[in-house]
């Protein structure tokens, strides 16, 4: 089995405390270079693309340069999701790597930085010469622009000298091209799943275990990138071989269930993101 991508949580530490990001009691840590090397060696026959996040701010990793050097050493394509606050300070590092294939910037992050938009947009303009940039905004409901979304769009219009009709495009479309290699993606805000109460919903599917799996900072392997608490732990990358994990009873049950449009786990039944995407 091969996956289109595997999520690796290189740190679960963040420099912000956004209200839409769920809280947990996990030990705050980052993967050591030795641990990251082990992870890459164990997954390289299963994917060639990795996302350097589940929770946490990946650019906060104290050995970011060395982390990216390891991804280059093992020929991985890398995609990064960031809140953007550290982009300017990490620009020189990010520019070194041709294997970074996309940077997603969550513009909806809650920060008090006076020059946030200016610094993010100017830095991304430089990065976009070689790396696709996707700005992301979260909407409250039914793709309607709230106050913060409107502020973000106004700043985009101002910086990129966009026509005022751009606002209508944002309202009507999910994905908009701003300029070469720079895009805006919008989606409804979702709740991180942690409800494991049973309910009557038993029909549905998802891409977890099918297109991807995730590895948390403590090594726990989970079915999807939203199981940040390791509720559906399948194994541990430092203790188990991935081949064995993918043959485990729980993995096969979840995987076959999604193929059959059947929800086999309570976490999946209560996943707000999955419901928005697949139970429309």
Regions found by a protein language model. Name each.
Residues 14, 18-21, 206, 224-225, ...:
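Short cysteine clusters
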Residues 44, 91-113, 150-179:
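Structural recognition of alpha->loop->beta junctions
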Residues 1-103, 111-118, 278:
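Conserved alpha-helical substructure of the radical SAM core
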Residues 110, 126-158:
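Conserved strand-turn element in the central/C-terminal portion of the radical SAM core barrel
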Residues 209-211:
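Short loop/turn microsegments at loop-to-beta-strand junctions
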Residues 215-216:
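Short, acidic, Ser/Thr-enriched surface-loop or helix-capping motifs
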Residues 127-132, 158-201, 226-276:
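C-terminal accessory region of radical SAM enzymes
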